[in-house]
């Protein structure tokens, strides 16, 4: 045999393939008979072994096994039995044939709070007060906030008075220091409006006048007291003569003048 037949010649890249020969060489896979369920189950591996990309065999496997698998009725199980508890129970039943000891009962599902944790939470939620017993912490905070003894107390350095706010203490200290001084007579006052009313006694200014009798007053408070004399309601009554007065000061003047006891 010539040696040229044993040497492989390189293929010509310009040569076109014969597609008709390739089509004849293809083998057509057709099923001449209906599917055999047992044959498919034996031939197709379970989905855990198959590649996740192979979706068609997985679908066939699931569709064939769905009518055969009996679903577990979880709704009929008690609430305390979880799927883990069911597995433990089945394993203990299988092991009971191998060992002589009776199967242990399934352990109940662990609760979210034990007795010790519940007692500790209850102890943290309540606080003890002398004379009041156990009180919730929220009520205890409110009672402490409302208790004057729990607040900070401000003491006056001139006297023994105590105040709960710094502003009230500052207003009280002005009654000791008397910062408002009259330039005419040197009299001192704790408030500016008191000094202003005092200065009007020197100047003779009376800006507040009565609309009933045209009397004028240097201070507005004196005008209010005067207007009570024009009112019909007289609340202050003399016990001796049954005479009524609109102001307590007028009643005192009446008693000091010497009430005879008869009506006037």
From Swiss-Prot:
It is found in: Nucleus; Cytoplasm. It holds the Pfam family zf-C2H2. GO terms for cellular component: cytoplasm; cytosol; fibrillar center; nucleoplasm; nucleus; pericentric heterochromatin. Phosphorylated by GSK3B. Once phosphorylated, it becomes a target for ubiquitination by BTRC, the ECS(SPSB3) or the SCF(FBXO11) complexes. Phosphorylation by CSNK1E, probably at Ser-104, provides the priming site for the subsequent phosphorylation by GSK3B, probably at Ser-100 and Ser-96. Phosphorylation by PAK1 may modulate its transcriptional activity by promoting increased accumulation in the nucleus. Phosphorylation at Ser-11 and Ser-104 positively regulates its function in induction of EMT and/or cell survival, respectively. Ubiquitinated on Lys-98, Lys-137 and Lys-146 by FBXL14 and BTRC leading to degradation. BTRC-triggered ubiquitination requires previous GSK3B-mediated SNAI1 phosphorylation. Ubiquitinated by the SCF(FBXO11) complex; ubiquitination requires previous GSK3B-mediated SNAI1 phosphorylation. Ubiquitinated by the ECS(SPSB3) complex; ubiquitination requires previous GSK3B-mediated SNAI1 phosphorylation. Ubiquitination induced upon interaction with NOTCH1 or p53 is mediated by MDM2. Ubiquitinated in a FBXL5-dependent manner; preventing interaction with DNA and promoting its degradation. A zinc finger (C2H2-type) spans 156-176, 180-202, 210-230, 236-259. Glycans are attached at residue 112. SUPFAM superfamilies: beta-beta-alpha zinc fingers. Disulfide bonds: none annotated. Its main location: nucleus. There is a cross-link at residues 98, 137, 146 (Glycyl lysine isopeptide (Lys-Gly) (interchain with G-Cter in ubiquitin)). The keyword Ubl conjugation applies. The modification Phosphothreonine is found at residue 203. Keywords: ADP-ribosylation, Cytoplasm, Developmental protein, DNA-binding, Glycoprotein, Isopeptide bond, Metal-binding, Nucleus, Phosphoprotein, Repeat, Ubl conjugation, Zinc, Zinc-finger. Residues 1-20 are annotated as: SNAG domain. A motif (Destruction motif) lies at residues 95-100. Involved in induction of the epithelial to mesenchymal transition (EMT), formation and maintenance of embryonic mesoderm, growth arrest, survival and cell migration. Binds to 3 E-boxes of the E-cadherin gene promoter and to the promoters of CLDN7 and KRT8 and, in association with histone demethylase KDM1A which it recruits to the promoters, causes a decrease in dimethylated H3K4 levels and represses transcription. Involved in induction of the epithelial to mesenchymal transition (EMT), formation and maintenance of embryonic mesoderm, growth arrest, survival and cell migration. Belongs to the snail C2H2-type zinc-finger protein family. This is Zinc finger protein SNAI1. It comes from Mus musculus. The gene is Snai1.
């Amino acid at each position: 045999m010539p040696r040229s037949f044993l040497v492989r010649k390189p293929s010509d890249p310009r040569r076109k393939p014969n597609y008709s020969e390739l089509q004849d060489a293809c083998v057509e896979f057709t099923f001449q008979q209906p599917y055999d369920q047992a044959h498919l189950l034996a031939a197709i591996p379970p989905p855990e072994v198959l590649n996740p990309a192979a979706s068609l065999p997985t679908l066939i496997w699931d569709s064939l096994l769905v009518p055969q698998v009996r679903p577990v009725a979880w709704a009929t199980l008690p609430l305390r039995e979880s799927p883990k508890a069911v597995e433990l129970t089945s394993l203990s039943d299988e092991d009971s044939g191998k060992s002589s000891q009776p199967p242990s009962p399934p352990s109940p599902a662990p609760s979210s709070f034990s007795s010790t944790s519940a007692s500790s939470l209850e102890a943290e939620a309540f606080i003890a007060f002398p004379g009041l017993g156990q009180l919730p912490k929220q009520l205890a905070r409110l009672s402490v906030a409302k208790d004057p003894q729990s607040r900070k107390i401000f003491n006056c350095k001139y006297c023994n008075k105590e105040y709960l706010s710094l502003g009230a203490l500052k207003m009280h200290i002005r009654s000791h220091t008397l910062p408002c001084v009259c330039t005419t007579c040197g009299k001192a006052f704790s408030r500016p409006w008191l000094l202003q009313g005092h200065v009007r006694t020197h100047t003779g200014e009376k800006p507040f006048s009565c609309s009933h009798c045209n009397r004028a007053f240097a201070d507005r408070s004196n005008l209010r007291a005067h207007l009570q004399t024009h009112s019909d309601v007289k609340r202050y009554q003399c016990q001796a003569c049954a005479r009524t007065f609109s102001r307590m000061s007028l009643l005192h003047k009446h008693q000091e003048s010497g009430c005879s006891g008869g009506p006037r």
